[in-house]
Regions:
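Secreted, periplasmic, or luminal enzymes acting at the cell surface/secretory milieu
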Residues: 5-107, 111-120, 124-130, 134-157, ...
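Hydrophobic helix-and-loop "lid/oligomerization" segment in the mid-to-C-terminal part
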Residues: 53-56, 136-237
Length: 348
């Protein structure tokens, strides 16, 4: 699934089959390739640039390092992370986002990565020689993989009930020395997608219940949140360690594994505040979003020809400005981010 994600992108594979079968010739294909090459040659800054400078080993290393530096360590009680391999011989990886492709993107970007290292793959590569790695799905979110015309090729269909999935995950968690939960959001509709807002600040797909269940099953737990924005965390006091990874790109799995192992010291900081609840944000506290209740009741907002009027009364007091002005304590503050480094202050 991760190697042939774009075989069915628009005309890719169907057109190839038409050429191979002799239904069409290469004339049109050659013309399109010439146009791409012409643009590439005309726009390059260095006409002597050697071939093979796309997705090179240096680019892979840069992608991994960027991923490592973007990870934010939100919480790490009792030094739960990094994983101590002297005490860990079995690691349970739980969660759909551990095996789900996240680099795909359609629309104007038409993003096509050469490869993607998934979290489970990265963890197996880094820890597999020293510990047994086991996996449980935990929840079913988006079993498909089509985003704005790009098809990943993955098929993550699973017909088990939420109870069956959680029961399996808890059983696996109890059998392990350490648990890494990889969850969060994805790029399906009403998640981290364009053209639609999220329906809730909460994690979807029953993940809150799953995380609480895992916390009861194993105290050595790291929650890895793959999201593009804030989520509520009703279980925040139940889990010892939380990593906010965002979407880490093609080296996601290796970057995450490096931080989990302590090969890389997490140094990322939050670019905005995470609220405890939705009403801690000005737009929601003032009652203006998603619009005037009377207008919504009258049927407005259903299409672009019948819009809802929303007045942003909070003005410049958005994010941390609203929290500071109203003395609202966020879940995690703008600029927050821990590391594995410990400090001691001597006599002053």
């Amino acid at each position: 699934g991760t190697k042939n994600a774009y075989d069915n992108y628009y005309l890719a594979n169907p057109y190839k089959q038409m050429i191979l079968s002799g239904k069409v010739g290469n004339k049109e294909l050659d013309d399109k390739v010439r146009r791409l090459l012409r643009l590439a040659f005309h726009t390059t800054l260095n006409k002597n640039r050697p071939l093979g400078s796309v997705a090179s080993a240096e680019h892979v290393e840069a992608a991994r390092k960027i991923g490592e530096e973007g990870i934010v360590l939100l919480q790490n009680q009792n030094g739960t992370l990094p994983i101590n391999l002297n005490k860990t011989k079995k690691i349970a990886v739980i969660g759909e986002n551990a095996v789900k492709m996240m680099t795909v993107g359609g629309g104007s970007s038409s993003l096509k990565v050469k490869y993607e290292t998934l979290p489970l793959d990265g963890i197996k590569k880094r820890f597999g020689k020293d510990a047994e790695i086991v996996f449980a799905r935990g929840y079913v979110g988006d079993p498909g993989g089509e985003y704005n015309g790009v098809v990943t090729g993955q098929n993550l269909k699973d017909n088990r009930s939420e109870k069956e999935l959680i029961d399996e995950a808890v059983k696996v968690a109890k059998s392990a020395d350490f648990v890494v939960f990889v969850g969060g959001l994805n790029k399906s509709e009403f998640q981290d997608s364009e053209g639609a807002d999220r329906k809730s600040l909460s994690l979807p797909y029953n993940q809150d219940v799953l995380i609480s269940s895992l916390a009861k099953a194993n105290k050595n737990l790291a929650v890895v949140l793959v999201t593009g924005n804030a989520v509520s965390m009703p279980w925040v006091k139940e889990v010892p360690s939380i990593l906010q990874t965002w979407y880490l790109g093609s080296e996601a799995g290796n970057a995450l594994a490096s931080v989990l192992a302590g090969d890389a010291n997490p140094s990322g900081k939050l670019p905005f505040s995470f609220p405890v609840k939705l009403e801690d944000n000005g737009a929601h506290k003032l009652g203006e979003f998603p619009g005037n209740k009377e207008e919504i009741a009258a049927g407005k907002g259903k299409d672009k020809n019948n819009p809802i009027n929303i007045k942003y009364n909070e003005g410049i007091f958005v994010g941390y400005r609203w929290h500071d002005t109203k003395n609202i304590k966020p879940l995690f503050s703008f600029g927050h981010g821990l590391s594995y480094t410990t400090f001691e202050i001597g006599k002053v």
